[in-house]
Amino acid sequence: MPKISYLDHIAKLLPDQEVEAFQSCYLQKLPKTIKVVTSKIPTKDFIKIVGDMGWELEQTIQSDVFYVRKFTDSATLGQHFLHQGWFFYIQELSASMSAPLLDAQRWEIILDMCAAPGGKTIQLADTGAFVISNEPLNPRRKALIYNINRTWMINTAVTNIDGSRFGQEYPEFFDKILVDAPCSGEWMSYKTGGPISRNEWLIKSLARIQIKLLESAIDACKVWWKIVYSTCTLNEIENEEVISTITEKYKGVVELEFNKKYRPHRDHCGGFFVAVFRKTDRDVINHVSTNKITQKIPLKIPDFNISDKLQSQVKLYLTEQFDVSKIPSNSLFYSTINSIYLTTTDYLTLHSKLSLDKVWIPLFDVGRDGKRIPVHSLWNILGNLASKNVLELSDQQSQAYAEKKDLKITPNIQTTIDNFLLLKRKNYGFSLSKKVGDFLKNKLS
């Protein structure tokens, strides 16, 4: 089937008075938007910090996502120390729309079925819910793990399962599910200046995949809980027609609670579609109620240790070395022969039921002599809680450090842990460094 102009296709769907406005928006860069990492810093504190720097933010329809209307620093947003320190991350407004519709809560187990590169997983984990972040493709999964590690989200685990198999392997297991489905991404051509065309055959092929993913999500979701479906495209085949197929096939099993198509000229964001389903009954089509979750082989970790003794030892060490006394109650430390990691107690109930690919954030390497050596993610996980072996930086020092520079410091700064220091800005954890003579060696990655 031949490719046709995407803009010509959209023109058939819009009122005449909106066509020109849409075409104009499509050919322009979107305004920069950022999401505040609220599990690290309250939004009001972040606004105060950047306001003092001369930034001008404008509230979007999301409470923790802002347009950046004025940015006064010489560094780019991505190079800024507040980004390197994960006070915020850069996320298009449209990409932030779907995750909040799940209304994630701390005690819930949520599946992000098509998770890479990880922005929506981070949004969901930022609420305190435990997120199973799935990506079957290895290169994309590596990027997903990298982003989760950078943002220190300990309440996450990564799986590498074909999304269409979740319903069969884990029937009625998850409280809520996000299906941010692979799509034609017709709206995304503005990013690369690529050809603005559409391929009907490709779109229909993707729609069949999207339907399979949604069917799997329906089977894997508990009764009376939510499923959110989203795409970054605007055509009907991947959006309204997919939704229609699901609601007709699963009548009495799911109800469509909400759906919206975000258009750039109306909503000041990228093109996006989102739909919210409520599962109201078991799926009699696939007989989910007769399935049972089989015991999974736990992730094999050499010399794995989660003993009560280890929990006490690590907590005592963190208290003695960093004066960290308010460790979250759901924290779970575990060790191997070479490292010590942190996750949450959700792991205790999940590891035998799910085939997990990754479920930890590293805190320390363990030397041959048994000595604990802090690793970079320690600062972001516990930096806000530490008051010993810490050093407060200025904005200028923080930016220099974000640019991978070593910092010259006062020689009389003392540490009690092999010259390691947790760096802070405005009393929030920023980075980890090692003092060598009069310099802080840069360990930002």
Question: Where do the language-model regions lie?
Answer:
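Polybasic, low-complexity RNA-engagement segments
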Residues: 1-53, 280-445
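Mobile active-site "lid"/loop adjacent to the S-adenosyl-L-methionine
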Residues: 128, 139, 174, 178-216, ...
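Conserved class I S-adenosyl-L-methionine
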Residues: 106-116
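Conserved SAM-binding loop of SAM-dependent methyltransferases across substrates and taxa
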Residues: 117-128
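S-adenosyl-L-methionine
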Residues: 134-171
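Class I SAM-binding transferase module
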Residues: 205-206, 211, 215-219, 224-245, ...
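Short beta-strand element of Class I
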Residues: 110, 129-134
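Class I SAM-dependent transferase core
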Residues: 62-104, 144, 435, 439
